[in-house]
Regions:
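Active-site cores that bind ATP or allylic diphosphates and position pyrophosphate for catalysis
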Residues: 1-143
Length: 143
């Protein structure tokens, strides 16, 4: 699924604190210290419900972190969705000529709910063999 020698996706064993924007900075520092060169900060990164603004965790890097204080590159991610037109996941603000019907949208909360109920997310979001592993995990977590 990824070209060889271009991307390394790894897990990071740190429990979420749900501390919002300041936790995003903490994640950047920890990952930088572990050798990461980039960090994707998504919508509502480390947030809980609607307590923090949807993009505050991205904004804090330009508003509160002095230039040059971090050696890790922050990638601010917008809303992501599967584009039916393009056949791939996209940042919604980066594609032209799309209407709401051209996207398949799922929130993380919705995906976890589906997995907990033994429902696989659409194949656009997860390979079936991965969805099976996740469903098994969430079903065990729910007991």
């Amino acid at each position: 699924y990824f070209p060889e020698n271009s991307v390394m996706v790894t897990g990071y064993g740190f429990d979420m604190l749900y501390a919002g924007p300041r936790e995003a900075i903490l994640h950047a520092i920890f990952r930088q210290n572990m050798g990461a060169t980039h960090l994707i900060v998504g919508r509502d990164h480390a947030g809980v419900g609607d307590y923090y603004g949807a993009f505050e965790a991205q904004e804090i890097f330009s508003q509160r972190v002095p230039e040059g204080a971090l050696d890790i590159e922050i990638f601010s991610a917008d809303h992501t969705a599967f584009s039916k037109k393009l056949g791939r996941v996209v940042m919604m603000n980066e594609v032209d000529g799309h209407t709401a019907d051209d996207f398949v949208l799922l929130s993380g909360t919705k995906v976890r709910e589906m997995l907990s109920n033994g429902i696989a997310p659409p194949e656009e979001f997860s390979r079936p063999e991965v969805a099976k592993v996740l469903m098994d995990y969430y079903q065990i977590e729910g007991t």
